[in-house]
Amino acid sequence: AAGFAAALTGQLQGLSTFIIEKESRIGGASALSGGGVWIPNNHYLQEAGVKDTYENAKTYLDATIGDRVQEILKETYLTRGPEMLRFFHDNTKHIRFKYARNHADYYAHLPGGKPTGRSIEPEIIDLRLLKEWEGLLLEPTISTKGFTMTGQEFHKVNMITQTINGKATSLKLGTRMITSKWTGARYASLGRALIARLALSYKKSGGKFRVNTAFKDFIMEQNRVIGIVVQSNGKELRIKANRGVILGAG
C-alpha cells in the first residue's frame, strides 16, 4: 500500500511514475490484511465525532513505544498522517475510508489510549471499476462464501444472536450478496478494497505498472541513483528515473 501511495502522490503532483512488481499480482501483504489504518486525529475520525488531539495520540505513542522510536519520527507520523489522508480524499474520487468504531487501541488502558479506537478502514468497492486491472489484484486466501463485509460489520454480525444490531447487519449482508448476484457487482472489502482503491486512483491518474518484474540493482552515476536494473521475462532491463526511485519493500 505504501508503494502505491507514494506513486499516486507523484502522479497527483504532476510527475510520471512507474511501478514494478515482482509478483504476478498486485497488493502483497496489504491486500491480504484487514486493511485497517491507524492514524490518530484524522478527518474521518473527526467527522465521526471522535474526540482526539495530537497531544493525546503523542501521549499514547510515548506510553506504548517510548524511546524505541525517535521523537522526530513519532511527530512526523502524527502530523503528516492526517495530512496524507486529507490529500488523498481531496485529490481522488476513490480513496475513501470510514471509522471502524470499537476497534480498540491495542493498549487502550495506557495513557492516551482509546477503548473505542482510532482505526479507519476502506469502504467496500465494486471491482468492476478496475476493468482490465481487476484480474491483477491478489486473491483473498480465505473465502467468505459470497459475503463481503467490512471489519466493523464482521464485529456486529458476530453478535447476531445477542443484539438487534447484529441481526440488522446480517440482513444487510444478505441483501448485499443478493444484490451483487443480481447486478453482477464484484465487491471487495478490507485489504483488497484498500489496494483496489489505491490502484483505481493510480490508474485514473495515468500511472502505469508492470508485474513479474523484479528489482536487481540501482543504476548509479556520480554517486547518484538515476535508475534501476530489473529482471522481466528472463531479460534484464534498465529503467531510467529522472526524479528518483522509491523502494516499497513491504
Which residues fall in each region the model found?
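N-terminal Rossmann-like FAD-binding beta1-loop-alpha1 element of flavoenzymes
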Residues: 1-19
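Short, hydrophobic/aromatic-rich segments at coil-to-beta transitions
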Residues: 223-229
